[in-house]
Amino acid sequence: VLSSKDKANIKTAFGKIGGHAADYGAEALERMFLGFPTTKTYFPHFDLSHGSAQVKAHGKKVGDALTKAADHLDDLPSALSALSDLHAHKLRVDPVNFKLLSHCLLVTVAAHHPGDFTPAVDASLDKFLANVSTVLTSKYR
């Protein structure tokens, strides 16, 4: 459960992320592909090289989805329902991969905003990403 302080930290962080969400999403995907190469199996049709248009486009989708989620902290299931259906029924992404991408997203945000990435912000964003992951995997049954 996100506390009021967590929600404030998330809103503040996404305010700073601002128009960089797509770039950060792509960077986090690149980090994930490099650090956890087994995740590449879900993207066999992608050019996974640094700066590829496909990774950038998917990074934009990730960034847009997280921005939408950050704007709907009190109703993540509704905000992410279509995305949850897609990942559960069509893409069938192993749920562990959401945790890996979440880690890479945290590293990316920390790298770009080191002065703002306090332990409290880290904890709040980690809880937020865990909640998003839970929603995305909720329809796997």
UniProtKB/Swiss-Prot annotation:
Gene3D superfamilies: Globins. The keyword Amino-acid biosynthesis does not apply. The modification Phosphotyrosine is found at Y24. GO terms for biological process: hydrogen peroxide catabolic process. Keywords: Acetylation, Heme, Iron, Metal-binding, Oxygen transport, Phosphoprotein, Transport. The modification Phosphothreonine is found at T108, T134, T137. GO terms for molecular function: haptoglobin binding; heme binding; iron ion binding; organic acid binding; oxygen binding; oxygen carrier activity; peroxidase activity. Red blood cells. The modification N6-succinyllysine is found at K7, K11, K16, K40. The modification N6-acetyllysine is found at K16. It holds the Pfam family Globin. The modification Phosphoserine is found at S3, S49, S102, S124, S138. The keyword Ribonucleoprotein does not apply. Involved in oxygen transport from the lung to the various peripheral tissues. This is Hemoglobin subunit alpha.
